[in-house]
Amino acid sequence: HLSLRRQRQMCIRDSDNVCHVVGKDILRFHAIYWPIMLMALDIPIRFKLYVHGWILTKDGKMSKSKGNAVYPMDLIDRFGIDAVRYYLAKELPLGNDGLFSYERFIERYNFELANDLGNLVSRSISMINKYCDGVVPNKDIVKSGEYEQSLCEVANKAITKTIACFDKFRIQDGIGETWQLIKRANKYIDETAPWVLAKDDNKREELASVMYHLAESLRIIAILIAPYLVAVSYTHLRAHET
């Protein structure tokens, strides 16, 4: 149990990092009543409010009586918590209501998580295992050509813009910026065709350079997706360390 004095000290010290995540229907309690109480206690008002909308279905608000309620645990049991977290982050933008439908959920799961991200991770890791014995090549052998420069530009842009979006709680936009890098990395595989380079002994260094750029892309992506794809990010960052 924290004393009132201790709570006050923590509130003042950490208030710049405090964010209230609330639904729009209880905004007044956090935007009006809570600041009044802080002012009465002479505590600075420096917290942030992240106010999200409602999660709707095509029939409107979810209701048990209507029989259109979606139970999160059922989704988590079937698809995993990361997939549910990703969908909500993508479909519930700041300041607006979000729409949930099983069709839309499956579409995002298949096309974005499985096809875009999943294929990139699977292809990259399998090629690093096959062509480099599972060891990421040393940075010293890296060569930078037209494709590598383009990939690096997209990566740097994704880092800057994703962080900027997240700092402003524009989670949906931040995810979109990260996905630009994911799509570019997938394109990089097609452009460089590592399976062709692997057939030519004179292209070993070029192949190693491609593998390095793919591994580095995965590392950056793993960091950027960490807020909403926690398990995926942790798994691949640990794999990268190993």
Question: Where is each model-derived feature located?
Answer:
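Alpha-helical recognition segments enriched in aromatics with Gly/Pro capping
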Residues: 6-9, 13-102
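General helical secondary-structure elements
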Residues: 1-4, 81, 119
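Flexible, glycine- and charge-enriched loops at secondary-structure boundaries
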Residues: 1, 27, 148, 204-207
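Helix-rich, typically C-terminal accessory recognition domains appended to large enzymatic cores
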Residues: 91, 96, 104-141, 151-238
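Single conserved hydrophobic/aromatic residue that forms the stacking wall/gate
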Residues: 1-8, 12, 236-239
